[in-house]
Structure formats: structure tokens, C-alpha cells
Amino acid sequence: MVPGRIITELFAGSLTMRGCFMQIFYIGLFGAFGCLSRYAVSGWTYTLVGRGLPYGTLVVNVAGSFLLGLVMEATLHSTVLSPEVRMGITTGFMGGFTTFSTFSYETFRLFEDGSYLAAGANIVLNIVICLVFAGLGISLAKRI
């Protein structure tokens, strides 16, 4: 289910009030864990490799791309996860964990500071590596 359709489906009668509440609950719960995980992974990354580029953002975006590809593909035609938990993981956790807005801001600041090569590298690394890892997650899920 597409997240923006929760309320629409509730009013259309295809989603119960309990189902709607559970999806919203899991999105919030998993979202909190996603935010905390992003904070931890970014901080850990910066202590390992420094802050020459926004490596913390790159690492969470790469990991998030892989995990989203894996979870979406592994649960696409499966009942391993309830729809509510799946929504919590994909929309909540991944929404809190990945950071496209931060990537955009940090890249803009690099341009603004005159670090054009670093800004370009940040764009290429985030887009290319995240696409590759999303594909790897999907490929892994198909083999499970």
C-alpha cells in the first residue's frame, strides 16, 4: 500500500480503523528507530573516516538503498510481514534512516563553499552507489 493512500482507503472502506491505526503506529515506531539508527551510523562513520565529504550521509543512503531493495523485494509477494509492519519498516524506518534532504543540503553547501569537486563527487557517489546497492538488495531478496 502506498503511504499516502492510508486515509483514502480508510474512507473508501478497504482499510479498517484498526488497520489504519496500526499502520500509523508502526510508521511512527519504526521511524523513531530509523532516526536513531541514522544518528548512530552517521556518527560512527565520521569517527572512522572524518568529514572531508559527507560520508555519514553517503553510508546511510547506501545502506538504506540496499535495505529498502531487500525488504521490498523479499516481502512483495509474501506474508512474512504483516502489511502494517512492512509499512513501518519501509516508510517509517527507511524514511527516518535515509537522508536525501540532508544529502541535498550538504551538497549545496559544498557548492556554496567553492568545493565543486567534492560536491560533484558527493552527487555521483550517492546516486551511483545507492542505485547499485538498491539493485543488490533486490537481487539478494530474489535468491532468498
Please give the residue ranges for each predicted region.
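Membrane-interface helix-loop junctions in multi-pass transporters/channels
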Residues: 3-144
